[in-house]
Amino acid sequence: MCVALCTVATALWSCDEDETYADQKEKERKAIAGFLSRNLTLLDAQGDTLLSTGKIKVITEQQFLAQDSVTNLDENEYVLFTNTGVYMQIVRKGPGEPIRSGESKRVICRYYEYNILGDSLQTSNQTPYWATNPEVLDVSNNSGSLTASFNTTLNGGGAMYMIYKNISVPNGW
């Protein structure tokens, strides 16, 4: 009987404390809107600026494609990829041709991953420790669908792989 009462009490207490999925999505939307509209500056332990976002101007994928798949840095543009919810600023397009169907290429990148709900830098490979180990991605085009995995054979893996221990590249990368 005592176990049954504890179970019921726990279930009732849990229901009062749990956020619904709709509540979580609303909280996420508000956090994203707040992040996009403020001027954020991330500092390292010595007080040096790591990243300053400025006020972000969001553009659509259609605008992004019309601009030759780059974002305007002077206007602090970020493209929103609606299928993943990822906002990305393309600093440089890079040399070479786009990956054709059936082809694979190696891509090297650096990144900041910011946790807007925790208001903190989550991970980054733009620190002296990771300077010699950028993210190395093996990207393939399978009939127009791009897939990628972190290459760990060249440098043992970059920060993203070492932190999350997964060779799968997050959606939107």
Question: Which positions does each model-derived feature cover?
Answer:
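C-terminal motif of bacterial Sec signal peptides marking the signal peptidase cleavage site
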Residues: 10-14
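Cross-family detector of peptidyl-prolyl cis-trans isomerase
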Residues: 15-173
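Sec-dependent N-terminal signal peptides
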Residues: 1-8
